[in-house]
Amino acid sequence: MHPLVEKHRSELKALALRHGLRDVHVFGSMAREDARADSDVDLLVDVPPGTSAFVLGAMLMDAQDLLGRRVDIVTRSSLNPVLRERVLREAQRL
């Protein structure tokens, strides 16, 4: 896991809990530790049924403020079937 994510791991988990999200993982270059200075942070989350898109938007903005980088949030149910296996294989739980 990239040092930036590791440094803010507990804060990211707290943000997720505050927004009612669970089982948060990092994937992509930040999980593989081949991120560049301009790489974004990819987060995979499980959302309870009925969760509003506003909740994901709030989590996204809070995570970007915390990390000082662009963040992408993907729900497990919305994973692209073509990429699903790779994402799940490399995902690391926060």
Q: At which residue positions do the language-model features occur?
A:
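Catalytic core of pol beta-like nucleotidyltransferases
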Residues: M1-H25, A31-A37, P48-L94
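Conserved G/P- and acidic residue-centered "switch" motifs that form tight phosphate/ATP-binding loops
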Residues: G28, D42
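Short hydrophobic/aromatic beta-strand micro-patches
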Residues: L44-D46
